[in-house]
């Protein structure tokens, strides 16, 4: 329910739309009319402010019929703080049954918030997570204190609750004491979403939608991978010893992808190659640029970018042929730098996706990135080619947990120097990741990408799936045949060469800003869908003259001197003077 011009209800509608939930916005008067007239066809999930909800309860309680209709027609309600603090206080006391219940202003010295698992399955991966909110979270928020046992605190600070599960006349009411609802259209200047800045405006409503609507978009599984940037495949690289690291992976249940610089394709150690080849469930490699020179994929020159991409993939193919180590066709940008042109070019290669920390291009006038963009499984703003986002461990377990709540894969990035304490910080972090609610599936980076999608059941035996990378693993885990309707965002259908499911070519259709195709899978059957794009032709031009080759070689060798010797023995000197990448 909404008042005319309510900005928060508009934000609620956007969040519901993001999860694919249909919305019927009504004024309080319209809802009360339909409610009294018994014109509500199915049980509703109600979203409104405390001001409106308080007035609704006053209307309901005017007759026994009103209470009966409430019980018969409402599934549950999500209530957030309105502008009338007195109405919020009265509502809190009514729902808790505690006439002495108090609402205190949150202050900027607020302690850690704890997300409870008191309502089984409600908070998903976030259950049990503790996080420290930023100052932005405490404005327009209150702490609810009540001595009754009616309330279940879902998000709390000490004994006070900021989000609670209550009841009214036998119907579950989720009660948030903040006035803010996350705005999915808000631009993110950094391109990175930090849940610590939006705990109260985001976690309650996302948790409720996932709990209340069985038909919402969701990820079929939570996948994870640790990515280590840059190492040459030799016995040791900086603080990283591949044999010892394998033992850690086995003991602590995780997998590692090496973002491998194609320039190093002839330099892998036979012993380490054998280690990777014999342990594909633990070790994998992806494509980390081409030469790893400064901003090599930040150019706007499409021919140069195409040449770089093709050279990188050719080198990776040579490395695979030479060593037998398969590589994931996923690009990890050196220094995180990319341009819009680079994304357009990479889409028309054999790469299936990109993985990056940054989501804003280095173009003079970059595209704006919104909250909705970074909440998605992958950022799809650049030529409909995905950027799967990754994070450093120091961004907090809470950010990885919230990503997983949204359905995003957990891609963790480190450099070898993060292992400088004998991997203690890393292992502590991985162990905490593995204790999150919901099983993490540690996979190669390519598997993480190809298994990342969101889906929902349209009808019995019919699944709608949205794919992001140009390769998707589709599975039917049920004992019955299942029909899959698959869609992918695409604004340039003329770029598509063909679509295959295994060896079978599929027909597809273009509709607005997406392509759609369908397939049938027998019980317990799986297949891999691949979208192939027309390649870009080269004009034969190359920037790789002798001077460039020498400078690139010096850059790579100096980087290894830094990582293998200087950082280990002269870390303070390196941090001040040695900036080769």
Give the role of each language-model region.
Residues 236, 293-322, 365-402:
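Alpha-helical scaffold elements lining the catalytic groove of polysaccharide deacetylases
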Residues 191-281, 328:
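Active-site beta->alpha N-cap acidic-glycine motif
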């Amino acid at each position: 329910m909404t008042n005319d011009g309510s900005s928060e209800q508009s934000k609620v509608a956007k969040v519901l739309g993001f999860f694919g939930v249909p919305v019927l916005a009504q004024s309080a008067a319209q809802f009360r009319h339909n409610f009294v007239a018994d014109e509500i066809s199915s049980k509703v999930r109600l979203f409104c402010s405390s001001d409106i909800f308080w007035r609704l309860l006053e209307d309901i309680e005017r007759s026994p019929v009103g209470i009966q209709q409430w019980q018969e027609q409402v599934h549950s309600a999500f209530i957030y703080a309105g502008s009338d603090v007195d109405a919020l206080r009265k509502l809190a006391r009514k729902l808790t049954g505690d006439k002495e219940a108090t609402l205190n202003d949150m202050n900027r010295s607020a302690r850690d918030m704890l997300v409870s698992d008191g309502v089984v399955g409600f908070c998903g991966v976030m259950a049990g997570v503790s996080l420290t909110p930023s100052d932005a979270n405490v404005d327009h928020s209150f702490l609810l204190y009540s001595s009754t046992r009616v309330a279940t605190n879902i998000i709390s600070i000490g004994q006070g609750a900021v989000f609670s599960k209550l009841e009214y006349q036998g119907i579950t009411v989720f009660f948030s004491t903040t006035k803010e609802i996350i705005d999915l259209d808000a631009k993110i200047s950094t391109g990175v979403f930090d849940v610590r800045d939006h705990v109260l405006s985001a976690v309650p409503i996302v948790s409720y939608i996932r709990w209340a609507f069985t038909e919402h978009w969701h990820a079929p599984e939570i996948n994870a991978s640790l990515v280590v940037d840059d190492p040459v495949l030799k016995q040791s690289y900086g603080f990283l010893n591949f044999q010892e690291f394998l033992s850690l992976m086995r003991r602590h249940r995780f997998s590692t992808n090496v973002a491998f610089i194609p320039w190093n394709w002839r330099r892998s150690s036979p012993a380490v190659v054998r280690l990777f080849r014999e342990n594909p469930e633990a070790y994998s490699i992806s494509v980390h640029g081409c030469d790893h020179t400064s901003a090599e994929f930040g150019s706007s020159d499409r021919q140069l970018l195409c040449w770089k991409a093709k050279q990188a993939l050719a080198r990776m193919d040579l490395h695979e042929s030479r060593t037998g180590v398969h590589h994931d066709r996923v690009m990890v940008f050196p220094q995180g730098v990319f341009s819009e042109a680079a994304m357009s070019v990479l889409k028309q290669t054999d790469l299936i996706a990109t993985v990056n920390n940054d989501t804003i291009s280095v173009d003079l006038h970059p595209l704006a990135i919104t909250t909705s963009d970074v909440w998605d499984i992958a950022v799809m703003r650049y030529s409909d080619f995905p950027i799967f986002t990754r994070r450093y461990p120091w961004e907090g377990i809470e950010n990885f947990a919230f990503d997983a709540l949204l359905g995003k894969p957990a891609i963790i990035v480190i450099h070898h120097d993060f292992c400088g304490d004998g991997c203690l910080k890393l292992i502590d972090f991985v162990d905490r990741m593995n204790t999150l609610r919901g099983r993490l599936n540690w996979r190669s980076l390519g598997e993480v990408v190809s298994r990342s999608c969101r889906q929902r059941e349209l009808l019995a035996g019919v699944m709608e799936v949205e794919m992001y990378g140009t390769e998707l693993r589709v599975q039917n885990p049920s004992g019955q045949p299942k029909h899959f309707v698959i869609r992918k965002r695409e604004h340039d259908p003329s770029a598509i060469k063909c679509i295959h499911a295994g060896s079978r070519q599929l027909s597809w259709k273009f509709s607005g800003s997406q392509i759609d195709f369908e397939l049938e899978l027998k019980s317990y059957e799986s297949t891999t869908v691949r979208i192939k794009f027309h390649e870009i032709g080269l004009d034969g031009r190359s920037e790789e003259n002798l001077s460039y080759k020498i400078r690139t070689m010096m850059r790579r060798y100096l980087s290894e001197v830094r990582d293998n010797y200087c950082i280990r023995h002269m870390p303070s000197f390196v941090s001040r003077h040695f900036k080769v990448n």
